[in-house]
Each structure stands twice: as structure tokens, then as C-alpha cells.
């Protein structure tokens, strides 16, 4: 393999390493597989990624991904705007919707605090959350972060952020397994955690 081709192959490996839980060895295996067995599928993947990069943006209200100004949930006038559930990632919204346990709205942080990886408060979209709360309709904030070190750290920062604001604040009950990500929790357990959520502070100034 020429040096130029070697650079191209290594470039593919390096690009694949940005994916979650994909290290150098996994990236190398994926690269070999795509080039040897899945060239047409790889071209479709490139096209789909380019299209998504052009068309998918953040919802102006909840910060999740969508193709218009507002996602379908935020645009739904039948949702209860008095309750705002704060979650880590868009997948958490999908799981909550599948569990059919929350008829309010959401805000997606798109990150969580992980001091070991140097991810501090700047990793979560507090500025956008503050803007979202400016409308005045919200009465209760439901913190729906995972019961992991990162999720607990994020929940603590959120609790401090809301401490002097006039909202009732609650967090999912610990029916969710310790160390469990919401993405992997079954619908029944998730619904119970919402219904039995723990009060952090009452509403009012």
C-alpha cells in the first residue's frame, strides 16, 4: 500500500474513532469491513451524513435535533407546558415517549458533567435552558438524569441552578438502577421513576 493510500486509510480510522466506544482497534476493523465488504453502503452512509449535517439542527425550544424550527413535541399544542423534563440526550426523550409517562415538554442538555474527561458546566446547555425558561409557563422542572457519577453531578449542578428560581424541582426516583443510563431502562421502570419522582424544592421564590 502506497504512503498516500496509507494516509487515506489512517484518516478513515481516525475519523471513525470519534464515535462513542470506538477505539483504535474497533475503528480499524470497521474501516476494513467498509472498504472490503460494504463499499456501496459506505457511500450511502456518507450521503446520509452529509444530508443530516445540512438539514438537522437544534430545536429552538428544547435543544433536541429536528429538521425545522421546532421539533414535533414542542410544536404540539396539546402538551402540558407547565412541566419541563430536563434530560441528557435525545434518546432519553424517545424512551420517555415510549413509556408514555410524561405529557409535558422537554429540554435536552446534549451533554453531562464528567470531571474525569474535563467536561465541566460548559458541557451542558445552561444558557439555552435559561432562555427556554424565559417564557414564564413552566411551573415544575423534572430532572431526569441517570443515576451515574456523571448524571448525579449534572443533577447537582441543575439543582443549584434552580435553587433561587421560582420553580418546583423534582428528580426521578431511584427505581432506576444505580449506574443505569435512561437509554437502557425498560418502559415500566421509567414510568414508575417519573410517577414517584422525588421533590427537591417547592415552587415559589
UniProtKB/Swiss-Prot annotation:
Coiled-coil ranges from the UniProt annotation: none
Residue ranges of every copy of the Toprim domain listed in the record: 82-177
Key word tRNA processing present: no
C4-type Zn finger ranges: 59-74
Keyword DNA damage carried by entry: yes
Function: May play a role in DNA repair. It seems to be involved in an RecBC-independent recombinational process of DNA repair. It may act with RecF and RecO.
UniProt name for this protein: Recombination protein RecR
Organism, as annotated: Neisseria meningitidis serogroup C (strain 053442)
Amino acid at each position: 500500500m502506497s504512503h498516500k493510500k496509507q494516509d487515506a486509510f489512517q484518516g478513515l480510522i481516525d475519523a471513525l474513532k470519534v464515535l462513542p466506544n470506538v477505539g483504535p482497534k474497533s475503528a480499524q476493523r470497521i474501516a476494513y469491513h467498509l472498504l472490503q465488504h460494504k463499499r456501496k453502503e459506505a457511500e450511502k452512509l456518507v450521503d446520509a451524513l452529509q444530508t443530516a449535517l445540512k438539514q438537522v439542527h437544534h430545536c429552538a425550544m428544547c435543544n433536541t435535533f429536528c429538521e425545522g424550527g421546532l421539533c414535533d413535541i414542542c410544536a404540539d399544542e396539546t402538551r402540558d407546558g407547565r412541566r419541563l423534563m430536563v434530560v441528557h440526550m435525545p434518546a432519553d426523550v424517545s424512551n420517555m415517549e415510549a413509556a408514555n409517562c410524561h405529557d409535558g415538554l422537554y429540554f435536552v442538555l446534549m451533554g453531562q458533567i464528567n470531571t474525569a474527561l474535563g467536561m465541566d458546566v460548559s458541557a451542558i446547555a445552561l444558557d439555552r435552558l435559561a432562555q427556554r425558561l424565559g417564557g414564564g409557563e413552566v411551573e415544575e422542572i423534572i430532572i431526569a438524569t441517570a443515576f451515574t457519577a456523571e448524571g448525579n453531578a449534572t443533577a447537582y449542578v441543575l439543582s443549584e441552578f434552580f435553587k433561587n428560581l421560582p420553580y418546583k424541582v423534582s428528580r426521578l426516583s431511584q427505581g432506576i438502577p444505580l449506574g443505569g443510563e435512561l437509554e437502557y431502562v425498560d418502559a415500566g421502570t421509567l414510568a414508575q421513576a417519573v410517577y414517584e419522582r422525588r421533590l427537591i424544592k417547592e415552587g415559589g421564590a
